[in-house]
């Protein structure tokens, strides 16, 4: 029922925020709140955030520089150059696009990690304004045509600022057959961007973190997952 579903979502939100360090679970910090919204006492964080997807092989072979050099990574409305293992993107318009075609993907959920940072602030306030970076795959399941539904399931986005940061993009792909897919990355704004890595994994974006009184696992997939915590903790 709705009440049971709402409780599951609340627990999901508390667990996710706690793992990301955005929500404290030390009881005294929230003693002023009503009991029905106080978090469970996980205690203080004891370990680093674990990304379960990264325990599987990376399906995209090569650094961004290698992908560009081999002609696998292509861009529209931008100029690209190589710097070490990374690439520098200089947009020509307010929206530029990168694409990697013929990525061989198995069936099942896919998590993509993109590590990037902006490098040339056009004005004094730009370091306070992050950039939007979008990612999408071809041949995703059909969802409702409403904009918000597509943003939630297929046209995912993250934020990139002036410190190197890794965004994750998680795609649920029930009943999608294995085959060659296209990864599309869209960058908003005209500020130069440096992409350090692009990695693709055939696992849900499950996060795990150890606390004083608990080990918290957050599973955003639509299916149950079997995780051997001894492999991570």
Give the ranges of each region predicted by the language model.
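Short, surface-exposed loop motifs enriched in S/T, G, D/E and P with embedded aromatic residues
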Residues: 145
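Active-site-proximal substrate-binding groove within the catalytic cores of carbohydrate-active enzymes
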Residues: 1-142, 151, 155-157, 161-162, ...
